[in-house]
Each structure stands twice: as C-alpha cells, then as structure tokens.
Amino acid sequence: MTRKIMLQGTGSDVGKSVLVAGLCRLASNRGLSVKPFKPQNMSNNAAVSDDGGEIGRAQWLQALAARVPSSVHMNPVLLKPQSDVGSQVVVQGRVAGQARGKEYQALKPGLLGSVMESFELVSAGADLVIVEGAGSPAEINLRAGDIANMGFATRAGVPVVLVGDIDRGGVIASLVGTHAILSDEDRRMVTGYLINKFRGDVTLFDDGIASIRTFTGWPCFGVVPWLKSAGRLPAEDSVVLERLARGGGKALKVAVPVLSRIANFDDLDPLAAEPDVEIVFVRPGTPLPDDAALVVIPGSKSTIADLEDFRRQGWDRDLDRHIRRGGRVIGICGGYQMLGTRVIDPLGIEGGKREIEGLGLLSVETEMAPEKTVRNSRAWSREYGVLLEGYEIHLGRTAGIDCGRAPVEIDGRRDGAMSADGRVMGTYLHGLFGSDPYRAELLRSFGIEGGGGNYRQSVDAALDEIAAELDAVLDRVWLETLLG
C-alpha cells in the first residue's frame, strides 16, 4: 500500500520544496519507490517534464531527487502570473486558459477532478508519495474550493505535517495561530510539525517546542538546520532574488535585470556557481552596473509589459551605454524577443498592448502566436561548436536578418539570432548555461578558465547532502514509520 504524507507551510517560502526534495532523495537512498506531488503551484519558473508538458521547476527537481522521470501529473495545476489577464492556467501540462483571481476561484472546484486523477496516477506503484502544499492552510478566506492544501488533504485522506520557518521569526505564533484558525476537520489532518531553517544550538528551542505542544498538542518531528547545500539547488520563486548575495571582486560581472514578470531565472544558477563569476540581480530603481562585462536578459511571462517596464527603469539607455563600452548581451526566450526591433501581439495573447518597439539590438521581429512550444531539446552551439541540452517554453515566432547568424541549432533547426559584431545574441533555448562545455567556452571568451565542474553532478550531490542532514535531525520514530 502506498504511504502518503503532505508538507504544508505556515506561510510561503518556509522551505517546503527543499524539504520535499530532501525527503524524496532520502527515501530513494533507502531503496523506496518515491514520487513527489504538488496539486497546485504558482510559479513562472517552469520545466518541461519527461512526458512533454509544463510543471513547476520545483517538482522537476523533486522528481530528480526521487530518481524517477518527471511527469505532468506531479503538478497537475500550474499558475503562471502574467500581465493584465491574470495568470495562465496550465492543467496536466497543457495551457487551459487564463484567469484573474476571482475567475480562478470559480474554476477550482472543476479542477479538483484533474488533481485527483493525477494523484492516483502518481501514487500507482509507488511506495511513498510526498505531497507539497502551497502558501498556507491558514488562509481560510480561500478554504472553500481549496485544492492546494487542506481541501486536497481531506479529499485524498493524506496526513499533514506543518512546516514553520524560524529564521524569519514568529514561528511559535505562526504554528499556534494556524492551529487556532483551522477548522476541527482540518486540524485533525495535522499529525505534527517541523521547524525549518534553524541556526545555532537546537536545545535553545526546547522551551519553544514545549510551548507549542501546550497550545496545540502537536508533536515536533524535527528541528532542521539552515541547509547550506540548498544554495546549490535551483531556486523556485523570484522572492529569493531579494536576498541573493552579490559578492564582489570576481573576474566576470554578469548583470541580470529583474523583470517584473521574470521567468526561469534559474537559467543563471550554473553561472552563479562558477567561482570567478559574480551575478548581480539588478532590482527596479537601480541602474545596470557600468562594470558588467555581460548583461543577460532572462525569460519573461509577459514580454511586452516587461519591455515597457525595462524602458521605465532606464535600462534601455544603460544597455546602449553597455554596448558602446564593448559589453556583451545575451537574451533568453522573452529576453531574446525584447532585443529585436519590434514585438507584435495581434491576437492580444498577453492581454496588453498589441505592439511595441524593441530594444533594436538585433535585426529581428517577433509575432506572438497561440501555439505554445514546450519541449526538451538537444542542441548544438554554432558559436562554440559544442553540444547543448536544454528546453523550450515559449509563445511567438521570431524572424529577421540576424537569424541568419543563428547561434544555436536545436534538433536540426536553427534557433536564435546574433548581431554582426557577435556581441549580442538571443535564443529560445533555456538551460544553455547548464551545459558544461558551453559554459566553459563562454567563460573562455572572457579570458576566464572555468566551466570545469559538472553542474548537474553538483546539484545531485547537494540533494544527497540534504538527505543526510534530514536523516540526522528528524525524529527517528516518525521517519522510520514514514519510510517503512
């Protein structure tokens, strides 16, 4: 019989995704067939699953941790926030439409069938399924029709473990408050809790555990330390960009403008892992740094709206100065579209303006189209003559003179564009920096010897380290019961 557990947070960004990934790897290391599941995710960091649809990147990573192929059924409902039209709704890997907040609330009861169907498919043949909630079950204003937290848990009969983040402060109040606000039915689903992101001597929290037990009756299943290895994993949400270290004094500075609807910014993680590379995420209201050698414009869920914001920030002028100083630019997906001379949206797919002038750094134009490209890809760098692996998730077709200097060949077809002087390039291929040979050649073009490490092996090793830490700190009785 398949064992099931669900981690729900007392709030967003408490570390549920990493804990699920770590538990998946721990179970896999014990020889179990384990699978992750998240009923509903909201993220513009999407991945292409092994069965060819869109899922949250966190669930893709959790499948990697579990050593199983990723599937659209591991994240049956994915919400991708965009501009005035609200969020794009992806159901079982395919775009099902767009919805604003109230519209989506009305849709949720109808989505529960898809969620339960996917959960049954994921559970089939597994020893253990580890489910991740979204946000907090204490948001009782959203409880009616809920499919992400207690609504799912009660329907599927999955016991819940709450996760509280002690690093942000107020963890006792958040757990006790969640207990107080839950209905009797929902409260009965909770079997205990985990304290996450603890720094220092855990015995200093013994009185805290006793207090929580007094107010709630819930046992503590473990106090998890700050997991340093998690810093080597792809980040799920753009909220982490607020606190990423900027470092200094590195050989190569790479500036990344943080777009309002930034997507798939984990493209930068392999570069950030290089010891001689400093990634500077440039927040709105801050100019692009003068001393950056490379500017990377990342993906966007709403190219036209983000291009308007780009200009409002004055980044277009900063980029022109960067080019005049001899700097280089790489645009990925939506960033590639922005680099052209024009972006048109005749069908209003993005929900805003129908046409906008591009940054004019590539002689190409993009037309948005309803057909969405979603696929994993093997590619060839025509620029450096090395193999690439990545994925495509985009709307729109791009064409123009500079496409004749396409820097990438994907499955036999040319992709992207490059300026005549070779200093500006764009591509639809996500993940190119994660290809070790490409990253090495890119760094070499800046006079840096790097890219010698295997990024994917580094991620895999980090998962093993997290699993080992969880094995050491979690309550033995609870853990052995979970893992059988």
From Swiss-Prot:
Pfam families: CbiA, GATase_3
InterPro entries named in the record: Class_I_gatase-like, CobQ/CobB/MinD/ParA_Nub-bd_dom, CobQ_GATase1, CobQ_N, CobQ_synth, GATase_3, P-loop_NTPase
Coiled coil location: none
Keyword line: Cobalamin biosynthesis, Glutamine amidotransferase
Function field: Catalyzes amidations at positions B, D, E, and G on adenosylcobyrinic A,C-diamide. NH(2) groups are provided by glutamine, and one molecule of ATP is hydrogenolyzed for each amidation.
NCBIfam families to which the protein is assigned, alphabetical: cobQ, PRK00784.1
Protein name: Cobyric acid synthase
Species of origin: Sinorhizobium medicae (strain WSM419)
